[in-house]
Amino acid sequence: MTNIQSILIANRGEIALRVIRTARAMGIRTVAVYSDADASSPHVRAADVAVRLGPAPASESYLSVPALLAAAREAGADAVHPGYGFLSENAGFAEACHAAGLTFIGPPAEVISALGRKDAARELAEQADVPVLRSYRADEVPGDVFPVLVKAASGGGGKGMRIVREPEALAEALSAAEREAESAFGDGTLLVERYLEHGRHVEVQILADSHGTVVHLGERDCSVQRRHQKVVEESPAPTISADLRERLLDAAVRLCRKVGYVNAGTVEYIVSGEEFFFLEVNTRLQVEHSVTELVTGLDLVELQIRVARGERLPQLSARSDGHAVEVRVYAEDAAHGFLPQAGTADVVRWPAETAALRVDTALRSGGEVTAYYDPMVAKVTAHGVDREDARRNLLGALADTEISGLTTNLPFLRTLLASAEFADAGIDTSWLDTHPDLPFHPRLEPDGPTPFDAQDGWRLGGPRLPARAAAERTGVRGAASAEADGSVRAPMPGTVLAVKAQPGQRVVAGEPLGVLEAMKMEHTLTAPHDGLVTEVGAAVGDQVPLGRLLFHVQAEASS
């Protein structure tokens, strides 16, 4: 039996707080780590000890294995919990922890290595008789198999992933996906698979101990996605038959037994009708583990720690009690392609937690969301006796949530959960991409100018009084921008990856002008209207701040 008395959490934000909460309940000392950008973050104050890693960039802090190992030595930790993201699925980090005499709270390094790459995991799935989608070499994709999905062999989270519908678009998609994967994971290797247009994303929660016991804790449906990243997750999956459920649960256990899996993990599938196909294995705790915890009554972090100690798993029931739905609250602009946002949240108000409502967050009033890390700021999860009860509970919780001063997807989430499509469980993985306007009310024609449009204020009698207010979009889009000046500015700090337009070039509305990388994702900058490019304000490789003028398009005079 391994003695674990002090855990270093190699992560930040809400997952660090989540691990601290369970460790403290188990009487285990906790060690937080932080970058300069996170020096005053809640997880730093919540831990028993906190150690600085380095500057704000993740490569110099949360992704620095030497810095993390040095922090563990300095704080006297004897175990490391990786959380999710960052180094959580890095076999080299797990091996380095083992070599340093630290217990890694996750699968063995060799298992992470075997399953961490999608191409290797695919081969193992085939050996375990788990169905897989047909794949192709990037230079040998037949013209009659489109659409196809290009995805990174390493990592996840939608990075390095592109849907390609026509053969002529494949080369550019491969180039962009390779750049993004190399930046996010240090590995630009890609896979190309047949893309299922209206599939559902269903995954199985696995738990295994070092004594040969492998169990599943039911499945989750994660089909509501944007940019190939999950937005809403729920358990149990609402649309699959009992027979399909049994087959995909059995396949997940079979695969994990074959590879000698230990600790918590998730086997992900794409489901179409009564068929299911293997996607990948996430060798870590998932963001959406909270829905499983609410329907099973289990603490997955506690079970992770007990397994890492060498304990046998207790008798666990996979029976679901009711239904749970989780939403991810992101600092992003849903009205403009879910573009990540950075800034300060002036006022933050979360709903009160109850037995049926859980809020996982590190964002407080005055908290800052930086461009250095993932823009997820919270998870809000509701439980109910059935799916409709859980949905209504979650809608009520979101109505009681307020974030002012920072653009978030809260209005979008409220509209989405209230939609008939979500209530009827009719949303598949492509829904948000193929129905970009459905989460919003119909577009409204702009009104004429009014005094309220004045940017410097106006007064109609009465005394002048100071006031401050925060506005929140209700989900209504305007049909046009009456005063668009043609300026295309950097929506957040980032690196210019491509410049596709030059001064003097005529462009049409929506035509790509350039590509900006921010938060490890590529964002295509497009022309706001038909016109002539009169200015290009950056070159490839430039680091640009928020608001930097990158392009200017002079509108063509209407005839």
Question: Can you say where each PLM-predicted feature lies in the sequence?
Answer:
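Active-site "cap" helix and flanking loop/linker of ATP-utilizing ligase/carboxylase catalytic domains
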Residues: 240-274, 282-334, 415
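Long hydrophobic segments that form regular secondary structure
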Residues: 210-211, 245-276, 346, 353-401
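A glycine-rich phosphate-binding loop feature that marks nucleotide/adenosyl-phosphate handling sites
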Residues: 86, 90, 114, 193-200, ...
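Glycine-rich active-site loop/lid that clamps phosphate-bearing ligands
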Residues: 313, 317-373, 426, 430, ...
